Design a protein with these regions (language model features):
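Active-site neighborhood of phospho(di)ester-bond hydrolases with catalytic His/Asp-centered motifs
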Residues: 8-9, 32-37, 59-64, 146-151, ...
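Acidic, His/Gly-rich catalytic cores of divalent-metal-dependent hydrolytic chemistry
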Residues: 162-249
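N-terminal active-site segment of His-dependent metallophosphoesterases
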Residues: 1-58
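Active-site-proximal beta-strand elements of phosphoester/diester hydrolases
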Residues: 4-12, 114-121, 188-192
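Active-site neighborhood of divalent metal-dependent phosphoester bond hydrolases
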Residues: 48-49, 55-118, 122-143
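Active-site environment of divalent metal-dependent phosphoester hydrolases
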Residues: 12-17, 40-43, 65-70, 109-110, ...
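Short, surface-exposed, charged loop/turn segments at secondary-structure junctions
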Residues: 125-134, 159-169
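Short, glycine/charged-enriched secondary-structure capping and boundary segments
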Residues: 20-23, 47-50, 74-77, 131-132, ...
Length: 249
């Protein structure tokens, strides 16, 4: 029996991106994994949380924006734009959706014997995993052969085998890339951001992991960016949050 997980992360209140990903990849997965930051930046926090809840994911973990939007953190470490947006999100959320975010577990969380998920890294849910040193520390902390992470909004993949670290995906164009998991290696993989990519590709990022065949396929999916931008402007959120969606930065 095949078991396939849809992997989505960093939706950030972008309903257009989320719905497009679900439409394009619908029917190609059995379960859903959500790696945090459902909200923040985008103008549809309630619709996104509602949609994620409707999916009944196998596992959802919190991101740093979810924590602030839920009132679990003050967001003092955020830059001015991010903090403005997340405080707007806090006010916009319904009590039920804020309560849902409050109860999301932190990462890392084991999915099965093959996979674990985290938002930032296996050693710190809020830390960023950008380079080789970050990856080595994450490999040391990871408890499964494959660790799926988010937070950076950059699609990338690292492999560690025979005491050697290599980048096996990105950063850059990862659309359509398929990686097979070797039984003698460990992997750290970021599928990119659904709602606010920052790797130069404005298309929504997602992945499907086939746990039975031990492989992952990365996707970049065009979505109606202009509508997401229109909603951000209509909500009175910072203009930069609308502009950056077109740039993928």
């Amino acid at each position: 029996m095949t078991l396939r997980y849809l992997v989505i992360s960093d939706i950030h209140g972008n309903l257009e991106a989320l719905e497009t990903v679900l439409t394009v990849l619908g029917g190609r997965h059995d379960k859903v994994l959500v790696l945090g930051d459902l909200v923040g930046y985008g103008a549809d926090p309630n619709a996104v949380v509602d949609r994620v809840r409707q999916l009944d994911p196998h596992l959802v973990i919190r991101g740093n924006h979810d924590k602030v939007a839920a009132g679990l953190d003050d967001g003092e470490s955020f830059n001015a734009v991010a903090r403005s947006a997340v405080l707007w999100t806090y006010e916009a959320l319904t009590p039920a959706n804020r309560d849902y975010l409050t109860k999301l577990p932190s990462g890392p969380q084991a999915v099965d014997d093959l996979i674990e998920i985290c938002h930032g890294t296996p050693f710190d849910e809020d830390a960023y995993l950008f380079d080789d040193l970050d990856a080595l520390r994450a490999f040391e902390a990871s408890s499964r052969p494959v660790c799926l992470f988010g937070h950076t909004h950059v699609a990338v993949g690292f492999r560690y085998a025979d005491s050697a670290l290599e980048i096996v995906a990105g950063p850059g164009d990862t659309a359509g890339l398929v990686l097979e998991f070797s039984p003698d290696a460990k992997y750290l993989i970021n599928a990119g951001s659904v709602g606010q990519p920052r790797d130069g590709d404005p298309r929504a990022g997602a992945a499907i992991v086939d746990a039975t065949a031990r492989k992952i396929e990365l996707f970049r999916i065009p979505y109606p960016i202009e509508e997401a931008q229109r909603k951000i402007r209509l909500a009175g959120l910072p203009e930069v949050l609308a502009k950056r969606l077109s740039l993928g930065r």
